[in-house]
Amino acid sequence: MRVIAIVCISFFSLFNIAYSQILENKNVSFLTIQDKLLENPLSGGVDNAQIGEFDLNQDGINDIVIFDRAGDILIPMIFEVSTKKYRYAPQYKQIFPKIKDWVVFKDYNYDGLMDLFSCAFNTEGIAGIEVYTASLENQKIVFSKFDMKKQFKVLYFPTGGSSSVQIPIDYSDLPSIDDVDGDGDLDILTYEPGNNRVTWFQNVVKERAYSKDTLAFVISDRCYGKFIESGLNAEIKLSGKMDECASFLSPEITTRHAGSTVLSVELNGDSLRDLIIGDLTNNGVIALYNGGTNSQAWMTNQLTYWPAKKDSVNIATFLGAFDVDVDHDGLRDLLIAPNQRSISENANNISYYRNTGKATAPNFELQTRAMFVSEMIDLGSGSDPCFLDYNQDGLTDILVGTEGYFIRSSNLRNARLVLFENIGNKQQPKYKLVDSNYLNFNYFSLGSDAHHSFSPTIGDLDGDGDLDLLVGENQGQFFYCENIAGKNKLFQFNKPIYPFQDLSVRSNSSPFLVDLNRDGLLDIVSGTRLNTNDSNNQACGSFYYFQNMGTKSVPHFDPDYFKPPNTNCLGKVIVNSFSSKSYTSPEVIDFKGTYKLFSGNIFGEIKIIDNVEGNVQGHFSIVDSTYGNVQEGERITLSLADIDDDGILDMVTGNSRGGLGIYTTTFKVDGSVDNINLLKDYVEIYPNPSSGIFKVKNSFLKPIRISILDVVGNIYSSVIVDSMNSYEDHLVSLNSGIYIIKIQTINQLAYVKWIKI
């Protein structure tokens, strides 16, 4: 046994544990309504998945990274060898560059690290392909953008003489990056913008004996495989000749709609690269079989309902196919997912076809239509959570408003309020889905005057001691549900009133109830979809304020937001936006008599806004534009509460993808910043090393949180122990290696290295 003094700054650097500015993801359990424990509940949901392999923890085993085009966010999933399951690992988000629209994971320089081929349209500002080269620096993965020393940092090809242009690709498409000719370097297959033929951009690095860290492309074939796609639908016509491009009846169609995906893959074991094609107009994928050679592809057969009618892909819409070894059996499996933002299946939307055959005779069999997503909270699209205690048992529950589930052949959304009850205890929350359609709110989303994007908040508007419900929605008005249960009783609401007092913020209301002017009456602060203009049509703000002009028992609001004390320019704060779209979502917290305003926005940033107290008609100040460096993707929403009784506020987040995240903030409940000090006391860990059973001994007589982390900060266990000086843990199932034992009180922190043998 040895005593370890805690802890020097170099220790934090050594183990790369993110602290301070990056908020820590909270490990909270969630159960389905059938009592199934979700394995990755707080992964944030998935709408438009693109899936690739990447060895995230450098253990020699490829993991999975999902890029969701809806929100432009990466979702890292570590493969655990012992369980053969994937575990959400959000700490790895920090290593990747900002990706937009699409990404393909391929190792072009064969150094064992996957590089990133991605869309340049919304980064470089040109329709092209950018490449991020992965490398290791001090055992840390870093990326650098590949540069051909042209005007833009994108891939170019020569057009004659000294001229060259970028390899063009529409930002809505998805190319294939693959060694199609079998010469040992990666080529590119894509539809050029406006063209109904696939172009082969051949990589000539091997042919020209260039170094392996180089990329060089030429056009090898502007009708790869000799097939063409209809410009009107997903129909594909094959050529009867190996050296002649197919054509439709005269007049020949040579243009097409934007929206196609291409995957070069081995489908039948003949060593020739076949294709899987997805199209904007198709709810399935089409397989094209190569009857030519690798250097002269000729697609001679097609299967329009791949892999067979019985288990064919049927997902709306615009599908992408991704070949990865999901189960690590050495065979390439296929995952299929929709890639059309906003108008595609947004639940149970990743089909997994396992290769049950051999490398020389692939056979793809459907395993599930909800790969990864079945283990997440995924409520469709557009989640907006609110902490509350609906059953008044002293535990913090979660009510989530949603934009809704996609409904085929309809412009409607099946939007809901979804209730998760806290069935844990004061120190260890545990949530269970208890009502997937709380108060039957989906009724309002399915009619001719459809409402969706519900945004709930609570407060005692009528002064009777219980908490009423105000719900924002896509049209910018509000539903009001009066709670008639009485104080400290299970919520019971009257029939919703809509529109509540004719109040409107024009679109996507996101209300918060707070007595902002301190007159004893709850006012309404609301976010909105669009930044606002004043009565002179000058840009002025991102939040609306409706002051309560009624009485304690009878609230009254004037719908005229230009009429003081109302305003559509609250605080004169303009949140950064995209084409005026800001999607603000305010949360006002009273820190010992001083208000702070927190808000999400369209870019997935959390703003902290100060100078609010006693300044309703004045200018607020944004004091933190990217609080916590939270990475949940676009349209982040939030709610704050201390859900584990440790004196520190926790934050639940929603996003455009319909999932949830939970974080520990840096704010104590009194508003002071949680500047955690290093523990001055001594901690004993024994035995160390050990096979998985160890004891933690310390001298504190106060609640202590003990967490077990790996060296990159992933949490394996976290418990709170009250008034203790000894604690024993059993972690026999952990893999051998170095772990960190994190010991934390309300204002003190220690990290101790523990070796599992």
Q: What are the language-model segments listed below?
A:
Residues 1-24, 673, 740, 749-757:
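Bacterial Sec-dependent N-terminal signal peptides
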Residues 2, 329, 393, 678-679:
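A generic structural signal for short, non-catalytic loop/turn and secondary-structure boundary residues
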Residues 2, 6, 128-130, 524, ...:
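Detector for intrinsically disordered, low-structure N-terminal pre-sequences
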Residues 6, 677-686, 690-757:
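C-terminal outer-membrane/trafficking sorting elements
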Residues 11, 517, 693-695:
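Local alpha-helix boundary/kink/capping signal
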Residues 20-673:
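Beta-propeller-forming repeat regions
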